[in-house]
Amino acid sequence: TAMATIVGLLDKFGEDYFVALGNQNVMIESGSSALAKLETGECSVVMILEESVLKKREEEGSTLEWFIPDDGNVLIPSTVMTVAPEKSANNNVAACEAITDWLLSDEGQSYIVKGWMHSVLTDYPTEPYDGKPTQELMDTNIEVDWEKCYTERDSIRALFQENVTVE
């Protein structure tokens, strides 16, 4: 998730974006730590997965607010795949296909949405608890070059660490 976001931001804003982040001494924290620092006021703004905030709002009654930045958000898809039989220790394509079919069914998607994530079905009738409309997120999506994310990961990670990560 973090690497994909870094690649999307790099492609949209360029290396100067990371230099500017580093100059602001931003903190890099895990999701739960970032939320705790936001609630205590140690941080005034955090970049975090939507589902982390929605979960906290629903389960704990948190009053944390969240928004989509004017310049966009990065959508992180969750993939489902079936491994080729010759590459699989279990060689159970039928079970994999059954799981995939269930995940993509209305029932499977209802569990995804109950987990504070958005359905992959464009016509799914509900959003996660307190979530933004899926179309709104799609309309403001910052695209990720997934091939670049993989093939240039070492140099991009180094660029980010050199400019943003505090030593």
Residue ranges and their predicted role:
Residues 76-92, 111-112:
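A bilobed periplasmic-binding-protein/Venus flytrap-type ligand-binding module shared by bacterial periplasmic
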Residues 62-74, 84-86, 128-130:
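Short beta-strand->loop
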Residues 129-167:
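Extracellular/periplasmic bilobal clamshell ligand-binding domains
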Residues 1-42, 75:
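Extracytoplasmic ligand-binding site segments that recognize negatively charged/polar headgroups
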